[in-house]
């Protein structure tokens, strides 16, 4: 999955009895939890990818395939129009959405947080409004997935300043719809077992069946499903929080960790420390990525945190100190190495829009948070943005 594109099979059975069924259940669960909702009196703005014909086959982002294949029933509740939703160029798509949807009764958003934030900023630029409630006063829901939402929450709350706004997490990957947040009082998701997916889990080299998982353990996810995948490792890791019913929380990617110096830093550690540092310094982080800085004859090793701020901290030094302190508190291996082979992290701040522009140029939808070498970090640092978004 490190290539520019990965090709996986998509069958009509998986589109209807996995992905579409998952979306319908999201609507049902949201309605059950919010009986006074009026979200269905308007439309859900869905920011999809693009697709095209390769021979007789339709190939593209799953979101675009879903929009293309389900238009006849979901078109009543979704914006923008199909031909706009699957425009390949992001700038052109945003401009078209602004023209088409500003006057629409939008009550919900759905999609990946980072791309939706970029669209929301474009809408505010287009309309000259201060926040999205001045554009769409009936907004009440954002169904999000694809990445950890916590780093984006503050930005969304500033753009949509309403206590009535609800955020619902879904685990809807290209390979299948796997879980959703069914209980607003909890921070985990219910694993959906009747969507045509057979789950197995890997712990080290051991393959564990669903009935053998343990709470508190992190597992890599393997699926055999109705889209033709057979014992396929999707690249995600999850932690079980309950086994009756089965509940999970997203723990990161199997390849996203840093262990160059024996520090065993994982995404969960990084997210926890970053949020704590933001709370202590008033910062809001848009995007970040971490890479190792290798040891030399004269210098110890370190981690370089490349950070794009939505709102900068009151002091970068205090932010760096807080980040380091929290990492040491949550990861004993990191703390031990900080006393020997590791210096405090190096903080590199980049201009707003750098990460999004890099993703667009590389055809990626997500920023790799932790990378065990410097390939991604050096690309991002060398990348020149054409504009600040």
Indicate residue ranges for each PLM-predicted region.
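Conserved ATP-dependent adenylate/AMP-binding module captured primarily in the ANL superfamily
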Residues: 20-35, 95-104
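A general alpha-helical scaffold signature found inside nucleotide-binding enzyme cores
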Residues: 18-21, 25, 265, 269
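Short, solvent-exposed loop/turn and secondary-structure capping segments
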Residues: 8-10, 57, 121
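Conserved AMP-binding loop of ANL adenylate-forming enzymes
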Residues: 24-73
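Conserved adenylation A10 loop of the ANL superfamily
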Residues: 1-8
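Conserved substrate/cofactor phosphate-moiety recognition/catalytic segment
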Residues: 8-22
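Active-site glycine/GP-rich loop and adjacent strand/helix microenvironment
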Residues: 63-389
